[in-house]
């Protein structure tokens, strides 16, 4: 199957551009765009302003929902799970893990040219529209409105790629990025390697690395003299398996309420996830603290560090930790996909001038 055309990133507009923020600015979404804040981040009790995205990214292929006839035409197995809704539309039962996994396989084949994709039972099944949103927004972050930025020359590090390998797959197929994908679970990496081997379009573009230390993030993965334009991460949410199980129960209850159903959902929904994908000691807050601390060790090797932040209350300690480091720019992008709100936290030790030089040296057409 031919590789999808690599997308270029247009100049940022007032609607889509993320905005650099000084750590001393206060949090609240602005009613209208304000000038870019300049200067080096300094210690402060205040937090950067988050720019809110109430819909999917304008370049997101799933902006207008799922075209089920096109999807099951590309991936016939999906048709078994598609059914009409009371609203005259088509959908699947999102409480059925096999239906959700099959939808993902169809989306990856139809939109991204991935002919074979599968995950082990119990592994995290990612919502592709939200995952590719993250990819699009960090592409904007990298380009900073520079039309000459050659996306297919970018090297990207995915921390905790899991068994699904979704960020390397999407980044490779949408922007032509070269990836290093790491994980502490060797079985997860084995599954991603199987996906790569079954899809020639991914071969030679994704390198897998086992993180030998489950308490480290970048140490043990980033090698000496290695350069990355971006790092991505979807951290473990919870601090224990019990907390993760409780979170799953809440999601099940919310799904039942949204469906208006009093019928018990199946015990295993698409809110799956192996232990390392769902929880770690100290939870998301501690994971992010370790990531921020270790990022300083690789300040000159990575242009932008980024991570999803699922819990609003975890932003403040992140801002405080970044304020104590020699961080030049901190950005926060708040994204909304359906009822779910998540955030991309991004920081760079390089000034705007140095980032421009970096792009000219490594990402020029």
From Swiss-Prot:
Gene3D superfamilies: Vaccinia Virus protein VP39 (3.40.50.150). Residues 1-50 are annotated as: Disordered. GO terms for biological process: rRNA base methylation. It catalyses: adenosine(1618) in 23S rRNA + S-adenosyl-L-methionine = N(6)-methyladenosine(1618) in 23S rRNA + S-adenosyl-L-homocysteine + H(+). Its EC number is 2.1.1.181. It is found in: Cytoplasm. Residues 33-50 have a biased composition (Basic and acidic residues). Its main location: cytoplasm. It comes from the Bacteria. It holds the Pfam family Methyltransf_10. InterPro entries: METTL16/RlmF, rRNA_lsu_MeTfrase_F, SAM-dependent_MTases_sf. GO terms for cellular component: cytoplasm. One of its GO terms (molecular function) is 23S rRNA (adenine(1618)-N(6))-methyltransferase activity. Keywords: Cytoplasm, Methyltransferase, rRNA processing, S-adenosyl-L-methionine, Transferase. Specifically methylates the adenine in position 1618 of 23S rRNA. Belongs to the methyltransferase superfamily. METTL16/RlmF family. NCBIfam families: PRK11727.1. HAMAP family: 23SrRNA_methyltr_F (MF_01848). This is Ribosomal RNA large subunit methyltransferase F. It comes from Shewanella baltica (strain OS155 / ATCC BAA-1091). The lineage of its organism: Bacteria, Pseudomonadati, Pseudomonadota, Gammaproteobacteria, Alteromonadales. The gene is rlmF.
């Amino acid at each position: 199957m031919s590789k999808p055309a690599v997308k270029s990133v247009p100049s940022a507009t007032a609607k889509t551009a993320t905005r650099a923020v000084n750590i001393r600015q206060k949090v609240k979404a602005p009613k209208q765009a304000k000038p870019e804040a300049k200067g080096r981040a300094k210690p402060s009790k205040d937090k950067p302003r988050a720019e809110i995205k109430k819909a999917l990214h304008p370049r997101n292929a799933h902006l207008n929902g799922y075209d089920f006839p096109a999807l099951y035409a590309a991936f016939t197995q999906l048709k078994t799970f598609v059914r009409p809704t009371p609203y005259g539309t088509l959908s699947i039962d999102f409480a059925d893990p096999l239906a959700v996994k099959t939808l993902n396989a169809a989306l990856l084949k139809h939109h991204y040219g991935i002919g074979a994709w599968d995950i082990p039972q119990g592994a995290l099944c990612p919502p592709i529209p939200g995952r590719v949103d993250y990819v699009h927004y960090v592409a904007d972050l990298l380009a900073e409105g520079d039309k000459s930025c050659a996306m297919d020359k970018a090297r990207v590090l995915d921390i905790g790629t899991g068994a699904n390998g979704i960020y390397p797959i999407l980044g490779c197929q949408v922007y032509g990025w070269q990836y290093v994908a790491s994980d502490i679970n060797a079985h997860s990496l084995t599954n991603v390697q199987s996906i790569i081997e079954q899809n020639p379009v991914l071969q030679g573009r994704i390198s897998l690395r086992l993180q030998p230390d489950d308490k480290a993030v970048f140490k043990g993965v980033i090698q000496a003299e290695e350069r990355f334009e971006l790092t991505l991460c979807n951290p473990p949410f919870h601090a224990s398996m019990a907390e993760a199980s409780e979170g799953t129960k809440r999601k099940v209850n919310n799904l039942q309420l949204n469906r208006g159903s009093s019928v018990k959902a199946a015990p295993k929904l698409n809110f799956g996830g192996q232990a390392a994908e769902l929880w770690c000691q100290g939870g998301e807050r501690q994971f992010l603290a370790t990531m921020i601390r270790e990022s300083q060790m690789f300040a000159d090797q990575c242009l932008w560090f980024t991570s999803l932040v699922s819990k609003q209350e975890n932003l403040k300690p992140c801002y405080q930790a970044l304020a104590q480091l020699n961080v030049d720019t901190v950005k926060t992008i708040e994204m909304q996909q359906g009822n779910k709100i998540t955030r991309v936290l991004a920081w760079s030790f390089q000034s705007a001038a140095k980032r421009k030089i970096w792009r000219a040296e490594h990402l020029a057409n």
